[in-house]
Curated annotation (Swiss-Prot):
Disulphide connectivity of cysteines: none
Chain residues that bind GTP: 19-26, 84-88, 139-142
InterPro entries according to UniProt: EF-Tu_GTP-bd, EF-Tu_GTPase, EFTu-like_2, EFTU_2, G_TR_CS, P-loop_NTPase, Small_GTP-bd, T_Tr_GTP-bd_dom
CDD domains: EF_Tu, EFTU_II, EFTU_III
Region (G3) residue spans: 84-87
Region of interest (G1), ranges: 19-26
Residue span of region G5: 177-179
Domain of life assignment: Bacteria
Region described as G4: spans on this chain: 139-142
Organism the protein comes from: Clavibacter michiganensis subsp. michiganensis (strain NCPPB 382)
Top-rank EC class of the record's enzyme: hydrolase
Name used for this protein in its record: Elongation factor Tu
One GO location term (cellular component): cytosol
Domain (tr-type G): residue spans on this chain: 10-207
Length: 397
């Protein structure tokens, strides 16, 4: 028997949980999965327990979620793919790849703590990587008896959202308890239902770039014995039918190949659509021929480049950025889509240095080519932390 076909009967929306590492993102994700499985049983709504979402063995020993977990569920209105984005500062790299996959996100803030430095960092990062919409789950609300404290925390979170140009005044803020909901406490089960109603109503149905030429950044590469090499990622735009020719662009010389199979959530598809997480089986391609950071594209639609002009905002010290200025010939990493590439910065004439908190134009020469177009966003990173974010304004070479 072949794999089940993936049914596209409802709008598909990519969401996720972001926020401080100890505020209960993974517990909340498990609670959403359980509550929906109980309330709307279906083939999609299968309960995922905490351990399976928090998977990957070496991470749980230290109590830190590193990898991104994908959980699938549906409400009566929509089908959701939910990424549990890691919260620890060391793993902001994954946050960048995770947050980039969201049409909207649930910001998890513990009512017992309120917004912390990491919460701020995540909201800032969500803005930089283009998460269009945030709403708030005030988790652990069962542990706060004083209604006034809950109101103060809500106010603080709204101010934080507004400070990063999210709609802090109107974003839904729902009091939840992931733990109590998992235990089946009726009051808190209802709050999870209320949270998902808010997600249905407030995260706009994404406008997919289906008519543009196909592009999917490679996040992971693996071998399926007897079938060949599979690359996974989220299709950014376009559609791709089985047996289409594609090019693998960036980092190495461009290669042409054919897609012989497409999967999503372990189900076979005839085509991949913009906005979906999928796996592509590539004909005659070896595991070592492809790497994270490359893109799979419609032939001829995108070209690799090393030199570009860009404009970037350099984070202030308070936002977790550098403590001192940088000068011409500064060599940070430029994070494009799913990978870091070292680049050398040349500053505009008359600009001696760039201070934390400044916005600047720059010329950049990367040490490896990246599939690039004007308008493409990037993060500037050093030693694993984000120190700036910008956009390609002009391709030079």
């Amino acid at each position: 028997m072949g794999k089940a076909k993936f049914e596209r009967t409802k709008p598909h929306v990519n969401i996720g949980t972001i926020g401080h590492v100890d505020h209960g993102k993974t517990t909340l994700t498990a609670a959403i999965s359980k509550v929906l499985a109980d309330k709307y049983p279906s083939a999609t709504n299968v309960q995922r327990d905490f351990a399976s979402i928090d998977s990957a063995p070496e991470e749980r020993q230290r109590g830190i979620t590193i990898n991104i977990s994908h959980v699938e569920y549906e409400t009566p209105k929509r089908h959701y793919a939910h990424v549990d984005a890691p919260g620890h500062a060391d793993y902001i790299k994954n946050m960048i790849t995770g947050a980039a996959q969201m049409d909207g996100a649930i910001l998890v803030v513990a009512a017992t703590d309120g917004p912390m430095a990491q919460t701020r960092e995540h909201v800032l990062l969500a803005k930089q990587v283009g998460v269009p919409y945030l709403l708030v789950a005030l988790n652990k609300s069962d542990m706060v008896d004083d209604e006034e404290i809950l109101e103060l925390v809500e106010l603080e979170v709204r101010e934080l959202l507004s400070s990063q140009d999210f709609d802090g005044d109107n974003a839904p803020v729902v009091q939840v308890s992931g733990l109590k909901a998992l235990e089946g406490d009726e009051k808190w089960v209802e709050q999870i239902v209320k949270l998902m109603d808010a997600v249905d109503e407030s995260i706009p149905e994404p406008v997919r770039d289906k008519d543009k030429p196909f592009l999917m950044p490679v996040e992971d590469v693996f071998t399926i014995t007897g079938r060949g090499t599979v690359v996974t990622g989220r299709a950014e735009r376009g559609t791709l039918a089985i047996n289409s020719d594609v090019e693998i662009v960036g980092i190495r010389p461009t290669v042409k190949t054919t897609v012989t199979g497409i999967e999503m959530f372990h189900k076979q598809l005839d085509e991949a659509w913009a906005g979906e997480n999928c796996g592509l089986l590539l004909r005659g391609t070896k595991r070592e021929d492809v790497e994270r950071g490359q893109v799979i594209v419609k032939p001829g639609s995108v070209t690799p480049h090393t030199d570009f002009e860009g404009t970037a905002y350099i984070l202030s010290k308070e936002e977790g950025g550098r403590h001192n200025p940088f000068y011409a010939n500064y060599r940070p990493q430029f994070y494009f889509r799913t990978t870091d590439v070292t680049g050398v910065i040349t500053l505009p004439e008359g600009t001696e240095m760039v201070m934390p908190g400044d916005t600047t134009d720059m010329n950049v020469a990367l040490i490896q080519p990246i599939a690039m177009e004007e308008g493409l966003g990037f993060a500037i990173r050093e030693g694993g932390r984000t120190v700036g974010a910008g956009t390609v304004t002009k391709i030079v070479k």
